[in-house]
Amino acid sequence: LGVSAFVLYYRMPNAHHEIPLKDAQTALLIIQKRAKEWNINKNNIGIMGFSAGGHLASTVGTHFKNKKERPAFMILGYPVVTMDKNLTHKGSRDNLLGKNPSDELVKLYSNELQVTKKTPPTFIVHTKDDGTVPIANSENLLKSLQENKVPAKLVTYDQGGHGFGMRKKGIPVENWPEELKGWMKERRLIK
């Protein structure tokens, strides 16, 4: 695809919900600072995350305070987006916010509620048979992105479950990287 990738090993919150976000924002700043050295276009640095990592990626894309903290785009795979107890992944919510979070904290980390016109363009992939993270997470995020006129694409598949990643499974979901490639070309993120 012609991309450079970095893997972030972020700290777990341990009752400090802001820690993963700070780690991800710091990583973005380091990559921007060293972009020339690494032959990277500092204006095209995006973020990608899957499942709970999708929640962190969507948090980075909706909780930035300045342009340097904002990724140029988001790629989200079967993401946990909301902290609403009826739609979230309970383990992700408990790990980030604790067992009895305040309504204010739930709202703050329900990223579909944090979308603005400044949220970066977003590509989302999810399967309808995901038994771990309900597809409503992705659908509600897409709706918020569209309401704020943020370029967004949600690609859904009937089968694939949770955690399909990029591996071949002999079912249509294995084609999602081609959908992503087309989206990235359309946005001139790759050639």
Which sequence ranges carry the predicted segments?
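Short beta-to-alpha linker loops that shape the active-site pocket of alpha/beta-hydrolase fold enzymes
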Residues: 4, 9-13, 80, 158-160
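C-terminal catalytic histidine-bearing segment of alpha/beta-hydrolase fold enzymes
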Residues: 135, 139-191
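Acidic catalytic loop of the alpha/beta-hydrolase fold
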Residues: 83, 129-133
